[in-house]
Design a protein with these regions (language model features):
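Short, active-site-adjacent cap segments at secondary-structure transitions
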Residues: 90, 165-166, 194-195, 259-263
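Generic beta-sheet signal
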Residues: 79-81, 154-158, 185, 249-257
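Cofactor-binding active-site loop characterized by glycine-rich and histidine/acidic residues
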Residues: 36-39, 51-179
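N-terminal capping segment at the start of a domain
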Residues: 29-45, 190
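N-terminal hydrophobic or amphipathic helices/low-complexity stretches enriched
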Residues: 1-32
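Thiamine diphosphate
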Residues: 127, 131-246
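Glycine/aspartate-rich loop-and-adjacent alpha/beta segment that forms the canonical ThDP
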Residues: 2-5, 233, 239-291
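Histidine-centered active-site/metal-ligand motif
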Residues: 47, 87, 118-120, 137, ...
Length: 291
């Protein structure tokens, strides 16, 4: 059954590019990282590493790629974005607040009376398209959205973690998306190469490794694969634009990131800071690094 959308007469902006270029994105990324670190320190800790690795991906998507309108967060013709790695919600909140989806203070994050819960809630936070956090489910939901929106115009973007890609549901969904030829579905994998409990050792490698041959695996499931550096703004923009080219199959961007990017303390100990707190001295040093 094809869904018919009512034309509201309003236009969804093509993107929110202010013309500042890569230097402008770098400046905003630093400010977003300060927001993330300050918010997590205020509540006594949280997912520093994965939030800092994914924020550049979200920044380029929202500022240079997504067709969305913060003034009309439920516009039927908007692009959809699902942060499947919902434990990095603080990064999404920081980005949405900067886009003016809401003005609730980030300091309320994960507190009892705040709408900014530890994982995104689509019923409470403007701009959140799916309540995520149970790893492995986001792509399945994205497929449903892409099927409903096929031929209408909007694109569906799903942000996965590379650790999350060990969930079997991801690959069941990947197989279905390819079979349905969903070229309005785009996956971005935050390949920061670390997860909370480490990677399961493979028979060929004595040391823990991520899902081996990630690009080959996605190709084997029928996806178009793009690989890029996850903190190179021009490279990310090029990859996201390439993903929009109709090919009759879904596209995945494997973005090579650094867990804790921008904060040397976290980058040096990514396992510790998957979900952790920092003391006052460490926090002061982090804020100095991000000054």
């Amino acid at each position: 059954m094809k869904i018919e959308y009512i034309d509201t007469g309003s236009v969804v902006p093509a993107c929110h590019d202010d013309g500042s270029g890569a230097s402008g994105l770098a400046l905003e990324a630093r400010e977003l990282r300060r927001d993330i670190v300050t918010t997590l320190h205020h509540v006594g800790g949280g997912h520093y590493g994965g939030s800092l690795s994914v924020i550049d991906l979200l920044l380029v998507l929202y500022r240079r790629c997504l067709r969305v309108d913060p003034a009309q967060p439920r516009h039927p013709l908007r692009d959809r974005l699902i942060l499947s790695k919902g434990h990095a919600a603080v990064a999404l909140y920081a980005m949405l607040r900067r886009m003016r989806y809401f003005d609730a203070p980030l300091a309320g994050y994960a507190s009892f009376d705040s709408v900014l819960e530890g994982h995104p809630d689509m019923t409470r936070v403007p701009g959140v398209d799916f309540s995520s956090g149970s790893l492995g489910q986001g792509l399945s939901v994205g497929i449903g959205m892409a099927l409903a929106l096929r031929g209408v115009g909007p694109a569906v973007w799903v942000v996965l973690g590379d650790g999350e890609c060990q969930e079997g549901q991801v690959w069941e969904a990947a197989m279905l998306a390819a079979a349905c030829k969903l070229d309005n579905l785009h996956v971005v994998v935050d390949c920061n190469r670390f997860q909370e409990w480490g990677w399961a050792p493979t028979a060929a490698e004595p040391h823990p490794l991520p899902v081996p041959d990630m690009a080959d695996k996605w190709r084997a499931f029928g996806w178009h694969v793009i690989q890029c550096a996850g903190h190179d703004y021009d490279g990310l923009l090029s990859a996201f634009q390439d993903a929009r080219v109709p090919r009759g199959r879904p596209c995945v961007i494997l973005a090579q990131t650094s867990k804790g990017k921008g904060v040397p303390l976290v980058e040096a100990a990514p396992w510790r800071f998957h979900c952790e707190t920092v003391n006052s001295t460490e926090h002061a040093q982090i804020m100095e690094d991000l000054a």
